[in-house]
Amino acid sequence: MLHSALLNGVIMVGIILVINIIYVTFLTLRMILTLKGQRYLAAFIGTIEMLVYVVGLGLVLDNLNQIQNVIAYAVGFGIGIIVGTKIEEKLALGYITVNAITKELDLDLPKQLREKGYGVTHWVVGGLEGDRTAMQILTPRKYELQLYETIKSIDSKAFIISYEPKTIHGGFWVKAVKKRRIKE
């Protein structure tokens, strides 16, 4: 009988842990999708999220006198955040804008990036040690690391900073970046 009760306790902890990992993964993805303007997909995920949440919370509240259930709920919450953000990183939704400034004036770098499929706007800027090339580059997030490596392979001392644009309207970027495939 003791063995059966212990087994049931372990199973309950496992169920609560898994349910909360699933719940918080959905919660994290829903929040990210909402921030990226994917409201319908976010609403669908939110519906599933709430179903899972109610079941998980119900199990914990029905067994609140068992501290291991509360701990499993809390640990599942933390793991769910990690899992959700890892999934979002793999999906790499949206675009990034990268601003890069070369160490020295290099008008060939924008051309090389365009040949690889990136949308590039460039201009000459004055730096402390002379003229440099500044570029603004739009790319899907899934190509972000590849873009950094490409820039660094051409100019290892380039200054690079990136951010996620909230809205993109008009110009070459909207039409061409969506159609283009970035070349290795």
UniProtKB/Swiss-Prot annotation:
It is found in: Cell membrane. GO terms for cellular component: plasma membrane. Its main location: membrane. The chain crosses the membrane at residues 9-29, 41-61, 67-87. It is a multi-pass membrane protein. PANTHER family: UPF0316 PROTEIN YEBE (PTHR40060:SF1). This is UPF0316 protein BLi00691/BL01474. Belongs to the UPF0316 family. Keywords: Cell membrane, Membrane, Transmembrane, Transmembrane helix. It comes from Bacillus licheniformis (strain ATCC 14580 / DSM 13 / JCM 2505 / CCUG 7422 / NBRC 12200 / NCIMB 9375 / NCTC 10341 / NRRL NRS-1264 / Gibson 46).
